[in-house]
């Protein structure tokens, strides 16, 4: 029993570190209790913060993009969410959702306006597919990165999108709350560090949408609401 208590204490310490910030404490509680792991859209898992999802629909309504790019499909709930919001906007659109494996994809997520592709997100074929969709659905782009959370992968995805996004397009880098920002301090370099590395290399590409990031008090996309300049 003592060994179990020690193990639990170790795991809890990785997830929860008290601070004086109420918002940060709530963030840690929300993440550490896996609320995000039981969040669904129309019955399909999303694995997101509900306040982030609300923020995304506000961004989509304001931006009125014609193309939504999602790296990381998993169950398909978020792709369906984006498609449902886009249908309300009422203009031609496509949601491109890419994942290295669609074994967990819920069949109910498959809709005519969503193109699911099983592939590494950084494959040249994905960049080419995005170019084709840009021609077919001209206009603004909303892109969101939520696949492998390693720094290397996220940085590669940001670089893949660099020549494909233009001024006014929107990029969200999710799970940048990992590695102590403020959850899972021992995770290792992840999305947050990828954003920092990208901005060191390409300092003029993005403006941070701080108002969006701070709107609901916490976000899983810490430092990751980006508007292309």
Swiss-Prot record:
- UniProt keyword Transferase present: yes
Give the range the annotation lists for the signal sequence: 1-23
Q: Name one GO cellular component term.
A: plasma membrane
Q: Does the keyword Methyltransferase apply?
A: yes
Biological processes, Gene Ontology terms: DIM/DIP cell wall layer assembly; lipid biosynthetic process; methylation
Q: What EC numbers are recorded for this enzyme?
A: 2.1.1.-
Molecular function terms in GO for this entry? methyltransferase activity
Q: Keywords assigned by UniProt?
A: Lipid biosynthesis, Lipid metabolism, Methyltransferase, Signal, Transferase
Gene3D superfamilies reported for this sequence: Vaccinia Virus protein VP39
Q: Which family does it belong to?
A: Belongs to the rhamnosyl O-methyltransferase family.
- Which PANTHER family does the protein's record reference? RHAMNOSYL O-METHYLTRANSFERASE (PTHR40048:SF1)
Name the chain's protein.
Rhamnosyl O-methyltransferase
Q: Which organism is it from?
A: Mycobacterium leprae (strain TN)
């Amino acid at each position: 029993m003592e060994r179990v208590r020690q193990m639990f204490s170790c795991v809890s310490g990785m997830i929860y570190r008290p601070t004086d910030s109420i918002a940060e404490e709530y963030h840690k509680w929300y993440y550490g209790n896996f609320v995000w792991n039981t969040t669904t859209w129309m019955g399909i898992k999303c694995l997101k913060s509900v306040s982030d999802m609300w923020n995304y629909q506000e961004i989509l309504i304001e931006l009125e993009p014609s193309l939504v790019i999602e790296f990381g499909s998993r169950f398909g709930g978020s792709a369906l969410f984006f498609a449902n919001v886009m249908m309300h906007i009422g203009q031609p659109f496509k949601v491109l959702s890419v994942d290295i494996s669609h074994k967990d994809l819920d069949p109910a997520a498959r809709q005519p306006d969503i193109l699911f592709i099983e592939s590494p997100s950084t494959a040249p074929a994905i960049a080419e597919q995005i170019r084709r969709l840009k021609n077919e659905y001209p206009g603004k782009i909303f892109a969101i990165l939520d696949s492998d959370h390693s720094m290397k992968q996220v940085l590669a995805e940001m670089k893949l999108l660099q020549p494909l996004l233009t001024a006014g397009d929107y990029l969200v880098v999710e799970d940048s709350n990992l590695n102590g920002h403020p959850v899972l301090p021992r995770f290792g370099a992840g999305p947050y560090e990828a954003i920092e590395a990208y901005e060191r290399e390409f300092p003029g590409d993005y403006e941070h949408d701080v108002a969006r990031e701070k709107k609901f008090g916490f976000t899983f996309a810490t430092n990751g609401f980006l508007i292309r300049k």
